[in-house]
């Protein structure tokens, strides 16, 4: 239960950092997520909640880390972290983030993924990680939406 409490606190911390980063001009490649209809925003939010975090956690932690843990022990966590960060580098390739933005968010991504990985390693349950991952993704998206409401002319002009 302590893992969940730490994770929830961390989720709110990441959302606050996301809001500050967006206000500072980082993540402009994500503007397409907010410059759409209300229906599209709801679909995006549902995708974060139902697909993004859960599919990442099921594959990277539930399959990769779980498969490697018997032979590598804690080393499986390191492999998971490397794969998870490499996977998120797709944000740079797709143009959603610059390399500078990716590197700027790397410490937070590492801390979040370490928390998710450790929660599974210690509890043998994906539930805590799924809750925390969804919270981080959802609150970060809400921060993006909130920031867009504060500056509607900047978002719509890009």
What are these regions (language model features)?
Residues 38-158:
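Transmembrane helix-loop-helix hairpins at the membrane interface
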Residues 12-27, 87-90:
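Membrane-water interface of transmembrane alpha-helices
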């Amino acid at each position: 239960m302590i893992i969940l409490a730490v994770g929830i606190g961390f989720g709110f911390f990441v959302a606050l950092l996301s809001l500050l980063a967006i206000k500072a001009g980082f993540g402009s490649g994500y503007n397409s997520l907010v410059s759409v209809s209300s229906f599209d925003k709801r679909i995006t939010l549902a995708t974060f909640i139902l697909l993004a975090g859960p599919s990442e956690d099921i594959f990277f932690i539930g399959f990769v880390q779980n498969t490697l843990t018997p032979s590598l022990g804690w080393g499986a966590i390191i492999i998971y972290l490397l794969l998870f960060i490499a996977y998120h580098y797709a944000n740079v390739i797709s143009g959603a983030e610059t390399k500078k933005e990716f590197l700027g968010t790397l410490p937070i991504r590492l801390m979040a993924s370490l928390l998710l990985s450790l929660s599974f390693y210690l509890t043998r349950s994906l539930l805590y990680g799924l809750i925390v991952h969804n919270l981080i993704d959802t609150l970060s998206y809400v921060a993006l939406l909130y920031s867009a409401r504060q500056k509607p002319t900047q978002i719509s002009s890009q």
